[in-house]
Amino acid sequence: MPFTAALRLFRQVLLGAACFYATAAPAQTACPPGEQPICLGVCVCLPGSPRDTEAFYEQVQWLAAAGLETWIRQSRDRLALQESRPIPLHIRSQLESRFDLAVLETARYRVGDDAVLNAANTLLQHPDVTAVTLIDIIVFRNEADALDNGALWAHELKHVEQYLQWGVGEFARRYTRDHRSVERPAYALQIQIEREQTPATATGPRQ
């Protein structure tokens, strides 16, 4: 499937899944007996059982995960044809106690690919993406973060670690099912690094 078609399909399927999780419970009370809500952009009541509806949304979720995996792989392969750089040495030194060598050796980065970053705003359900990790290539929106933001690097390297541990398909499946559970450990590490880098003031540590 061409990249643009896969991107459009994933956006449509993701929208449907999001609408289901946001509106399914209210819609269930509005449907007549013997009918179930089907929500893809809008909700309609159709004949069927709760099991039929659950199976339908499992298929929707599978399609969404497949679309995300396709976007990740195709975007990464396109980026791999362009110049990328290893982790800056001072960033690597700062984080080497927190990651296995495989993560630090695998990860590379580049700066300012707007097509990838803007797509990630939608596909990764994040309104303001400052960096995105595509398997082993991290794309930063601005060079200052790439060169000096150790906390953001920690966040993105956590995703490199997840790709290595789970594989791309499983990463996409987990992210589609519950993106917060995938992002949570990355944000936790990012916040921890930020706090360690914040000097204590005369009145005590900054909260």
Regions found by a protein language model. Give the residues of each.
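Auxiliary, metal-adjacent structural segments of Zn-dependent hydrolase domains
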Residues: 29, 82-132, 137, 192, ...
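Catalytic Zn2+-binding segment of zinc metalloproteases
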Residues: 157-174
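Short, contiguous pre-domain boundary segments
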Residues: 70-81
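Short pre-active-site segment immediately N-terminal to the catalytic Zn-binding motif
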Residues: 137-154, 176-178
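N-terminal low-structure segments adjacent to metalloprotease catalytic domains
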Residues: 2-70
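Active-site or metal-binding loop neighborhoods of secreted/extracellular toxin and effector enzymes
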Residues: 178-207
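Active-site metal-coordination segments of metallo-dependent hydrolases
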Residues: 81-89, 174-187
